[in-house]
Amino acid sequence: MSQQKQKQCAPPQQCCPPPQQRCPPPQQCCPPPQQCCPPPQQCCPPPQQCCPPPQQCCPPPQQCCPPPQQYCPPPQQTKQPCQPPPKCQEPCAPKCPPPQQCQTSKQK
């Protein structure tokens, strides 16, 4: 009896259709062109990379800016609290430690 590529899934896991690939239990199924992303996300196309939650998928020219690390916009570096990074940026803006605030380099 030739065994087909059918694997029994444990209760925490689920089976995906043959064209799709199975992701870890917290995740679901992703179509073959897409790749599995860590949970809270689901799938991202192959050229794009997975980003943390406030973000999703970013195109290859752009990067995912880490949500825990905040940044200040390059044109406006004032004494204001750092704001969370956008979904995707081509160059990630300069990072600013959360306890500190972004300041302009004072030239005296």
UniProtKB/Swiss-Prot annotation:
Biased composition (Pro residues): 14-24, 73-100
Segments for region (Disordered): 1-24, 73-108
GO biological process entries: positive regulation of keratinocyte differentiation
Biased composition (Low complexity): 1-13
Function: Positively regulates keratinocyte differentiation by inducing genes associated with epidermal differentiation.
Name assigned to this protein: Small proline-rich protein 5
Organism: Homo sapiens
Source species taxonomy: Eukaryota, Metazoa, Chordata, Craniata, Vertebrata
